[in-house]
From Swiss-Prot:
GO terms for cellular component: plasma membrane; proton-transporting ATP synthase complex. PROSITE patterns: ATPASE_ALPHA_BETA (PS00152). This is ATP synthase subunit beta. It is a peripheral membrane protein. It holds the Pfam family ATP-synt_ab_N. ATP binds at residues 167-174. Its main location: membrane. It comes from Corynebacterium jeikeium (strain K411). It catalyses: ATP + H2O + 4 H(+)(in) = ADP + phosphate + 5 H(+)(out). SUPFAM superfamilies: C-terminal domain of alpha and beta subunits of F1 ATP synthase (SSF47917), N-terminal domain of alpha and beta subunits of F1 ATP synthase (SSF50615), P-loop containing nucleoside triphosphate hydrolases (SSF52540). The keyword Ligase does not apply. Keywords: ATP synthesis, ATP-binding, Cell membrane, CF(1), Hydrogen ion transport, Ion transport, Membrane, Nucleotide-binding, Translocase, Transport. It is found in: Cell membrane.
């Protein structure tokens, strides 16, 4: 099947060039006069390394003039020599699309890693495609209910929107993404595409095995370009995953979830490639084309009429600095931001979402409803007031607070603990079953806590549980002791 904005291969026969220079992952290739390949075309070259033949794929990045092109290698260039013959494939890097990709692991070039050769006989799409036209975009706004209390109440996700998970190392970004994949597969029977961009190979293996164990692998396609791969691969793997997701949206008319872990590594790979191509670095050493590269990716992640791609993107924040150009550029494209805070994680509250700094553009009465909005604002007000009182408590102690402030602090502590929740993917570590809390129950529970119905309950009764039934059961257990 062909779509209007699908990249089509050239009808011309393959053109051969030769390697004239190799500088790490950057390769200069000379072609016959007038037969230079187009930008983003895939080139292939055969090499022999220690008596083992392999094919290296290159992607055209620049036209240098004098019939020379500069290409970025998608594999280590060991064994590549000057004079080696290079073939222009006449089309961009292409990946398999459709049901064949579900339940399997691919690399950025579309090669199946768990079942070599899978998908190469079927339909393939080029990874460089135009975003949907303006008149194809969906105008209505709809909430994506996750069953995670802190998200549904305070930073609701938009169906077909872009969500950023911000946080430093080790605060739970990948765990939250794994939990979302599990919940979407269980609750909505939806299709998910996971793009592992520049993260640890061990995490990719763990994710594959966990999804297989939990029975959600058959509804998910996984595309990996991990930390040990060349920068060209890490820069393109997000586009490969997005292309698979676009097929499910545009051809199969499905609502798709696209998970990208980690979007910062996409930026980092672009910076490496930019330096290798000889471009002058911009702020903090990033590439001068940072905003443009991010826009090309993000503009394709959108809802069209009747179907959507909802994207959840983990964003590593270097040294917890939110003014760094990489996370700052990502902010501009997001509909909701979920900030994971180290200070909350240190209290043992997971997910470690900071309710005061996380945002959502749809948290307004006209979209989520008056009651939801009012309860969310009450929760935020109590938590904010508690934060303001912490300095006084640290210096003078709780006894110096007014009675009203004491009640506020005690309710804030209960709310803070109740915002934590058991995850399905963490069951085998904690021994506590995961919980799904419907949005209506979440709103009702927080309204009752804000009203003071549970002021007599100890804070420990609210630790990382599901709904109010769990709180009451925990309280009953504590009183029996």
């Amino acid at each position: 099947m062909t779509t209007a904005n699908q990249v089509q291969p050239s009808a011309e026969s393959a053109v051969a060039g030769r390697v004239v220079r190799v500088i790490g992952p950057v390769v200069d290739v000379e072609f016959p006069r007038g037969q230079q390949p187009a930008l983003f075309n895939a080139l292939t070259v055969e090499v022999d390394l220690e008596a083992v033949a392999k094919t290296i794929t290159l992607e055209v990045a620049q036209h240098l003039g004098d019939n020379l092109v500069r290409a970025v290698s998608m594999a280590p260039t060991d064994g590549l020599i000057r004079g080696a013959e290079v073939t222009d494939t006449g089309k961009p890097i292409s990946v398999p699309v459709g049901d064949v990709v579900k339940g399997h692991v691919f690399n950025a070039l579309g090669d199946c890693l768990d079942e070599p050769g899978l998908g190469r006989d079927g339909e393939q799409w080029g990874i460089h495609r135009e975003p949907p036209a303006f008149d194809q975009l969906e105008g209505k706004t709809e909430i994506l209910e996750t069953g995670i209390k802190v998200i549904d109440l305070l930073t609701p996700y938009v169906k077909g929107g872009k969500i950023g998970l911000f946080g430093g190392a080790g605060v739970g970004k990948t765990v939250l993404i794994q939990e979302m994949i599990t919940r979407i597969a269980r609750e909505f029977s939806g299709t998910s595409v996971f793009a592992g961009v520049g993260e640890r190979t061990r995490e990719g293996t763990d994710l594959f095995l966990e999804m297989e164990e939990m029975g959600v692998l058959q509804d998910t396609a996984l595309v990996f370009g991990q930390m040990d791969e060349p920068p060209g691969v890490r820069m393109r793997v997000a586009l490969s995953g997005l292309t698979m997701a676009e097929y499910f949206r545009d051809v199969q008319n499905q609502d798709v979830l696209l998970f990208i872990d980690n979007i910062f590594r996409f930026t980092q790979a672009g910076s490496e490639v930019s330096t290798l191509l000889g471009r002058m670095p911009s702020a903090v050493g990033y590439q001068p084309t940072l905003a443009d590269e991010m826009g090309v990716l993000q503009e394709r992640i959108t809802s069209t009429k009747g179907r959507s791609i909802t994207s959840l993107q983990a964003v590593y924040v270097p040294a917890d600095d939110y003014t760094d150009p990489a996370p700052a550029t990502t902010f501009a494209h997001l509909d909701a931001t979920t900030e994971l805070d180290r200070s909350i994680a240190s209290k043992g509250i997971y997910p470690a979402v900071n309710p005061l700094t996380s945002t959502s553009r749809i948290l307004e009465p006209g979209i989520v409803g008056e009651r939801h909005y009012e309860v969310a604002q009450r929760v935020i007000h109590i938590l904010q007031k508690n934060k303001e009182l912490q300095d006084i408590i640290a210096i003078l102690g709780m006894d110096e607070l007014s009675e009203e402030d004491k009640i506020t602090v005690q309710r804030a502590r209960r709310l803070e603990r109740f915002l934590g929740q058991n995850f399905f993917v963490a069951e085998k570590f904690t021994g506590i079953p995961g919980s799904y809390v419907p949005l209506a129950d979440t709103i009702d529970a927080f309204e009752r806590i804000c009203d003071g119905e549970f002021d007599a309950y100890p804070e420990q009764a609210f630790n990382g549980l599901g709904g109010l039934d769990d709180v009451e059961a925990a309280y009953k257990k504590m009183t029996e002791k």
